[in-house]
């Protein structure tokens, strides 16, 4: 099973970050997984690729497509009591189970700030949902040929190219990265990364 979830949070201890808090949020979610299944969390920690992704805090009432200013992205400030949304994706059914079962009222400590989990959305609201891999594949294969694909990045995103990081979201890098994640998770239906990269390189 694959899932896209959104945590509705309330800021317990406000303040600001001096840089993008991605690693802090990653650590907070890992602690939630460890609380649910310590043995699985240890095994997960040893993996090269982690089967989940974490988005960025979005203030309630703000459109998901709103463009963030650089300061708001890199040095965000959150007030006590402020409501936020945090988007997660799970590419592993054990991770999905752990995230869906985060107890309401759990405090996510991310650096000097902390946030209380008030609701977990996975029912279609905020473009969330859970789907079986086979169902996703069937839907993709039965869909009409896409004429246009739009990808929006709402948090700092880089792609590994040889020994360097590339911040330019070229189609070949985007879809090759997705192919890697699919393969590393040993999801059904083989994906040939070289073919994916070749086709994606033709996109403009």
Feature names for model-found ranges:
Residues 1-204:
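RNA-interacting cores
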């Amino acid at each position: 099973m694959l899932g896209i979830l959104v945590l509705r949070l309330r800021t317990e201890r406000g303040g600001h970050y001096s840089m993008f808090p991605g690693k802090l949020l990653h650590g907070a979610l890992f602690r939630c997984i460890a609380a649910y299944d310590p043995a699985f969390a240890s095994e997960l920690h040893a993996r090269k690729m982690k089967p989940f992704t974490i988005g960025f805090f979005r203030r309630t009432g703000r459109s998901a497509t709103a463009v963030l200013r650089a300061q708001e992205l890199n040095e965000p400030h959150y007030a006590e009591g402020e409501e936020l949304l945090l988007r997660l994706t799970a590419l592993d059914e054990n991770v999905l189970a752990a995230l869906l079962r985060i107890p309401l009222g759990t405090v996510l400590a991310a650096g000097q700030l902390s946030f209380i989990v008030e609701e977990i959305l996975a029912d279609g609201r905020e473009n969330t949902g859970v789907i079986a891999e086979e169902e996703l594949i069937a839907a993709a294969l039965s869909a009409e040929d896409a004429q246009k694909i739009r990808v929006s990045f709402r948090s700092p995103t880089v792609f590994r190219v040889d020994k360097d990081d590339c911040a330019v979201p070229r189609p070949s890098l985007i879809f090759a990265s997705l192919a890697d994640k699919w393969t590393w998770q040993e999801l059904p239906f083989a994906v040939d990364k070289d073919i994916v990269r070749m086709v994606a390189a033709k996109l403009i």
